[in-house]
Regions:
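Extracellular ligand-binding/catalytic regions of CAZymes and related secreted enzymes
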Residues: 1-43, 211, 219-353
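Short loop/turn segments at strand-loop or loop-helix junctions that form parts
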Residues: 3-5, 72-92, 126-128, 290-298
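Sec/Tat-exported extracytoplasmic proteins
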Residues: 26, 76-79, 120
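Post-signal peptide N-terminal segment of secreted/secretory-pathway proteins
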Residues: 31-114
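Extracellular/periplasmic catalytic domains that process cell-envelope and extracellular macromolecules
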Residues: 68-70, 116-118, 244-245, 282-283
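Loop/turn elements at helix/coil->beta-strand transitions in domains of secreted/extracellular proteins
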Residues: 70-74, 118-124, 286
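A glycine-rich, often tryptophan-bearing local segment used as a flexible ligand/cofactor-contacting loop or short
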Residues: 88-100, 104-229
Length: 353
């Protein structure tokens, strides 16, 4: 089961990389057909002439949800952020804020997750599941259900903090910083921006605040072996800062920031840790993963999905010089991670037959 509430058009499908791996591993529907990326998911379905349909769990009763939890072997909530007005029919600047048309985790989602958890069906969730536009009460239910807590902070690496040279820099971040600090935006180098749900903004610039502006994902030796991932992996995309609230959860991987002395002070001012979870996992008595990053959002090319052994040529699949190339993360980290999770799910299903 794939849940994706952020499908703006056929070129912006957040679960693309999941379907790529399903195709590559030759996972099929019960009738033998491959999963259709444009149909086989729950969430937002864009149409023509600015029309759309929603196919989710909101009109389902308890029996319907119970049936779904029984039928599916694994659930992956790839993106619950949803669709904003400026991204959809208004065609305005996507780097500005706007009202939500559809999105956020819902009470029905929570009900389904509870049933999946009870049946020990593997659950994968990720970045912004607890963030806007998920209601506060639903966020609390999710946190209590899985023993974690979102701090309210999210952030990402920015290749250039110069507003003139980087048109993709979110201007609402710039305005919020100016209003909050009553000072001009003077940043020019690469760095990181952090935004809190209450409106606070923190900006860390290379040299002044950060020795290395790029967050690193660190995985210990045991989990490197379990998931076939490298010891360290750069991650220059959106992350959320989450706290583990249950000792039964395992921190599979951690984010490491590299602040200077001045950066340490700035992080402490906003209570932002320099080491925090990248992947949380629980295996007993239920199987759950939370990816504290926008992991599923990768621009994979489907023409390679049917080529057996293509992973052996992964060094040709991304630009080794461009540190912001999402394909690097897909081939080196995300793909082996998801392959390991899916294989474990498949083996567990076979053992129960």
């Amino acid at each position: 089961m794939i849940v994706d509430k952020t499908v703006i058009n056929s070129n912006s499908i957040k679960h693309r990389s999941v379907n790529w791996i399903l195709d590559y591993e030759k996972f099929t529907r019960k009738n033998g057909d491959f999963y259709d990326i444009s149909k086989d998911y729950f969430g937002f379905f864009p149409g023509e002439d600015e029309k759309y349909q929603v196919h989710d769990f909101e009109k389902m009763d308890d029996n319907d949800l119970d049936s779904l939890s029984s039928v599916y072997d694994l659930a992956y909530f790839t993106d619950t952020y949803g669709v904003m007005g400026n991204e959809w029919y208004r065609h305005r600047d996507i780097n500005e804020t706007s009202k939500s048309i559809y999105g956020g985790l819902s009470e029905k989602d929570i009900a389904l997750l509870g049933k999946l958890k009870k049946r020990n069906k593997p659950i994968i969730t990720e970045y912004n599941t607890m963030g806007f536009p998920t209601p506060l009460d639903v966020r609390k239910s999710f946190q209590e259900m899985f023993g974690l807590e979102w701090t309210g902070w999210m952030g990402r690496y920015i290749a250039s903090l110069d507003t003139i040279n980087n048109p993709d820099l979110p201007m609402w971040i710039v305005r919020a910083f100016r209003n909050q600090n009553n000072q001009n935006w003077t940043f020019k180098e690469e760095g990181m921006i952090f935004f809190h749900i209450d409106g606070r903004v923190a900006v860390l610039e290379k040299g002044r605040h950060l020795n290395n502006p790029m967050p690193q994902i660190y995985t210990d030796k045991k989990n490197q072996s379990v998931y076939n991932v490298p010891a360290t992996m750069i991650y220059p995309f959106w992350i959320d800062i989450v706290i583990n609230r249950n000792d039964s959860n395992e921190i599979v991987s951690k984010y490491l920031l590299s602040p200077t002395w001045e950066g340490e002070k700035l992080l402490a001012k906003y209570n932002i840790p320099k080491i925090f979870p990248a992947i949380l996992h629980r295996s007993i008595p239920y199987t759950f993963y939370y990816f504290c990053g926008d992991f599923a959002d990768n621009p994979t090319k489907f023409r390679f999905a049917k080529l057996e052994g293509i992973s052996g040529l992964k060094f040709l699949m991304y630009n080794a010089v461009d540190i912001t190339d999402r394909n690097r993360f897909f081939w080196e980290f995300y793909m082996p991670m998801i392959q390991s999770i899916m294989d474990d799910c498949y083996q567990n299903r076979l053992s129960k037959k």
